[in-house]
Amino acid sequence: MKKIYFIAGEMSGDFIGGHIIQNLKSNEGLEFTGIGGQYMEEAGNFKSLFTITAINFIGFIEIIPHLLKIKKLIDKTVENIINSKVDLLITIDSPGFTYRVAKRVRKFLPNLKIIHIVAPSVWAYKAGRAVDYAKIYDCLFALLPFEPPYFTKVGLDCRYIGHPILEQEFYRDKIALRKEFKIDDNESILCVTFGTRKGEILRHLPIFITAIQKISKDYKNLRIIFPLVHPDHEAIIKPFLENVQFNYLFLSSERLKAYAVSDLALAKSGTNTLEISASGTPMVVAYKVNIISFFIIMFLIKIKYVSLINIMAGSAIIPEFIQFNCRANLISNKLKELLSNSQKRDNQVVESQKILQKLRFASDRSPSYIAAKIIKQEFL
C-alpha cells in the first residue's frame, strides 16, 4: 500500500487536491492522508490532521499574531509526515505554510519525493523563489502556460497542467436559471463576494454594502445574491444588512449557479474571479489589505493588475479597484456604468473568454487527470 501525504491550506487548494485524489482513486493500492478540507475528505478516505482554517492566513502584517501558532502547526505536520512513513508528499499552493513544511521534511527525509502544485508567482514578485523551490521539490505543476520556463531554467522539473478550477461544470443558461430562482424579467441580479477568510470579509463588507446601497437607489429592481463559501459566513455578513434598502438572498451550496444567473458581479480579487468569468458574467473586482502589507507588496510586486484575466491580457478587461481606490463611490459608479450598458458587459465577457481559453487545459484531458497520471507513472 503506497501512502500519499497531501497538504492544502485553503479552499482552492482543497478543491485541486480533491480532484486529483478522485483521479488517483482508481489505483486501489493507494492511501491518502494529510491536511485538507471538504473536497479532499469527500474524494477519498481522507481525514485531515487539523482544519485548514488553522493555516488560512493572508498578508504580511495580518499573519504576525498567528506566527507562534503556525510554527507549532508546522512542527506538528513535519512530525506527522515523518511518523506516517509516506511514499510521496504533495503540497498545494499556500506557500507560506507548505514551503516551510517541505523544507523541513527535506532535511529529515532527503530521499522522499516531493511535488508542489500551483507555481509561486515568481513572475510577479520575489523571483528568487524559483531557486529556493528547485532545492526542495522534485517536480512542480504549473497552472499557467507561461510559468514553466521560470523554473526549468534553474533546474526544477516543471509541468504545465492547466487550471483545475476550470474543470467544473459551469452553468450558461441564464434563462433557465432565472426561472429556477424565480427571478422576474424586470429584475437585475448583482452577485457579491467578499472573500473566504473572516478578515477579508470584514474588510470588504462595509465598502461593498455602501456601494450596493448607492446603486440600489437608482435600480429599484436590483436583487443581490451573496454566495457563501462557508455557511458560517452568513453570520458575519448579516449584521451589516440590518438597515439596507435592497433585496438580497444567501446561497450556501450553489455558488456557480449564483455566478451564472447574475447580470453583473462585484468580486473580491481571487480564484472566484475565474469562476465568475467562466460563468459568462461580467464583473468589477475590488481588493483591500492592511496598509502596511500593501506597501510591502508594492515594494515587491512587478505587475500592474491583480486579476488573472487582466494579468494574462496585459490590460484592464475587468475594472479593478485596489486599496486606495477600493472606495464605495468609485465602485458604485462603475457598477452603474456596467448595469446601464449591456454592450460593455458583453464585451468584457467576450474578451475574458479569449483569455480563459488559454487557461483551460494543457491537452484534451483535465488538469487533475494529467496531474494524477504523472504522479502514478513517475512518482509512485
Swiss-Prot record:
Matches recorded under Pfam families: LpxB
Cystine crosslinks: none
Record's keyword terms, sorted: Glycosyltransferase, Lipid A biosynthesis, Lipid biosynthesis, Lipid metabolism, Transferase
Keyword Transferase: yes
Pathway terms, separated by semicolons: Bacterial outer membrane biogenesis; LPS lipid A biosynthesis
Keyword check for Lipid metabolism: yes
GO molecular function: lipid-A-disaccharide synthase activity; phospholipid binding
EC number: 2.4.1.182
Catalysed reaction equations from the record: a lipid X + a UDP-2-N,3-O-bis[(3R)-3-hydroxyacyl]-alpha-D-glucosamine = a lipid A disaccharide + UDP + H(+)
Top-level enzyme category: transferase
Highest taxon above the source species: Bacteria
GO terms, biological process: lipid A biosynthetic process
Signal peptide limits: none
Cellular component terms (Gene Ontology): membrane
Family affiliation: Belongs to the LpxB family.
Record-linked HAMAP family: LpxB (MF_00392)
Job description of the protein: Condensation of UDP-2,3-diacylglucosamine and 2,3-diacylglucosamine-1-phosphate to form lipid A disaccharide, a precursor of lipid A, a phosphorylated glycolipid that anchors the lipopolysaccharide to the outer membrane of the cell.
Protein name: Lipid-A-disaccharide synthase
Organism: Rickettsia typhi (strain ATCC VR-144 / Wilmington)
Gene: lpxB
